[in-house]
């Protein structure tokens, strides 16, 4: 199957996310504190859609080989095992009657190092990183709840342009479904 048309749609969405980030950064330069070697976002837990996983896999296979690839895959396996345990605990908590909001908040507080983060705290696939990573330092909304990077200077109670992550995930899901 030729994934190229779907990957192009994903790349267009990624570029749009980059443009939104830059507009917010230009409008609020004192609030957006993203900089090279700041890896706070590289420990956040989030899911990838099918199209994002395919895109990252394609770029990963094109860039890495041999021992370097093996080392990165081992880091990915370790992160995956940690995340699996966290998800399993979240499922048990849900079945035990813990409110879903509390579970999601607890998961949001967890920190797992991204396997693409190198020893210099730089992303080895930065140009091809997921959309969530591209938007992390600006105000976002997930399920109607506003979120910001803890290192940013956006103030609670003030109004800022906010990216609706649910809409972006909806578009990512649409592209992913087109693949099937």
Question: What is the meaning of each model-derived region?
Answer:
Residues 1-180:
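Short loop/turn segments that flank or connect secondary-structure elements
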């Amino acid at each position: 199957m030729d994934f190229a048309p779907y990957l192009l749609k994903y790349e267009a969405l990624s570029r749009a996310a980059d443009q939104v980030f830059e507009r917010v950064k230009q409008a609020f330069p004192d609030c957006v504190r993203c900089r090279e070697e700041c890896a706070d976002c590289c420990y956040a837990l989030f899911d990838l859609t099918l199209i994002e996983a395919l895109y990252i896999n394609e770029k990963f296979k094109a860039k890495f080989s041999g021992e370097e690839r093996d080392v990165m895959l081992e880091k990915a396996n370790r992160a995956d095992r940690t995340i699996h345990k966290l998800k399993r605990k979240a499922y048990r908590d849900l079945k035990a009657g813990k409110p879903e909001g509390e579970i999601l908040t607890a998961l949001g507080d967890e920190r797992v190092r991204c396997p693409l983060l190198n020893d210099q705290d730089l992303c080895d696939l930065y140009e091809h990183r997921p959309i969530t990573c591209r938007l992390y330092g600006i105000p976002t909304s997930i399920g109607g709840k506003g979120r910001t990077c803890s290192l940013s200077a956006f103030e609670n109670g003030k109004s800022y342009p906010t990216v609706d992550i649910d809409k972006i995930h909806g578009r990512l899901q649409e592209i992913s479904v087109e693949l099937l």
